[in-house]
A protein has these predicted regions:
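Helical segment within the ABC ATPase nucleotide-binding domain
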Residues: 165-178
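Conserved ABC transporter NBD signature motif
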Residues: 58-66, 73-74
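Catalytic Walker B motif of ABC-type/P-loop ATPase nucleotide-binding domains
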Residues: 151-155
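Hydrophobic anchor residue at the start of the ABC signature
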Residues: 140
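ABC ATPase "signature
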Residues: 210-211
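Conserved ABC ATPase "signature" region
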Residues: 98-102, 107-122
């Protein structure tokens, strides 16, 4: 049984249709990508999955729970790093982790988590003094501190230099290798091709294709995921 199931999801804001008849599923232990340009409905979809927004229609199941009705129980089993989340500049790294750990009944050991993510030396540094890559490592640590079964990572590498992006990719793979299922939201084609076992391509609030990167390339008759995306979204 899939860990995440979405069926015919729809969400509007006034006259604007943000998500329109979206369906997909995520299997245990995979990195599943939600790929699309800005405004495609990616973030709205994952916010609905976390119980942060209420869809107009459709059904969702995350770890066998309804995000709308069971959001308190779901928060104990799902970790998230959202696109717009940001810590105060004057909070220290260990203070942020201790704060987030206090939200969970059985949190991870924060010292071990800092060590695994290469943040031990930054433990007493203020968040505002960290590099972009270090801030993203902290974001991943906060998403993992509750020992989640599913981690939602939204536009994780936006604004990072190429070296920091590749370091972050390795961390995401490490997270998956510990048994955590990852829902990765991105607009970077190379990131999706490198990391995702399967993915859903979003365009104008709809899912236009799902599959492995190789399946999507083959379906479009293209040699790269970038070219396949352009073809499948009708932009060529």
């Amino acid at each position: 049984m899939p860990l995440i199931e979405v069926s015919n999801l729809r969400k509007t804001y006034g006259e604007h249709v943000a998500v329109d008849d979206v369906s997909f599923h995520v299997e245990q232990g995979e990195i599943f990508g939600i790929l699309g340009t800005n405004g495609a409905g990616k973030t709205t979809t994952v916010e609905c999955l976390q119980g942060l927004r209420t869809p107009d229609s459709g059904t969702m199941s995350v770890l066998g729970l309804d995000p709308g009705k069971d959001h308190t129980a779901l928060r104990q089993r799902l970790g998230s790093q959202l696109q717009e989340s940001r810590l105060p500049d004057k909070i220290k790294v260990h203070e942020a982790l201790d704060l987030y750990a206090s939200f969970y009944a059985n949190p991870a050991d924060t010292g071990d988590l800092l060590a695994k993510l290469g943040l031990t030396e930054q433990r007493d540094k203020y968040f505002g003094k960290l590099s972009g890559g270090q801030k993203q490592r902290v974001s991943i640590a906060l998403a993992l501190v509750g020992r989640p079964e599913v981690a939602v990572l939204d536009e994780l590498t936006t604004g990072l230099d190429p070296h920091a992006r590749r370091d972050t990719w390795k961390l995401v793979e490490t997270v998956r290798d510990t048994g955590v299922t990852v829902l990765l939201v991105t607009h970077f084609m190379d990131e999706a091709e490198r990391l995702c076992d399967r993915l859903a391509i979003f365009d104008a609030g709809r899912v236009v294709a799902t599959g492995t990167p190789g399946e999507l390339r083959d379906r479009a008759g293209k040699s790269t995921l970038d070219e396949a995306f352009v073809s499948l979204t009708g932009r060529d």
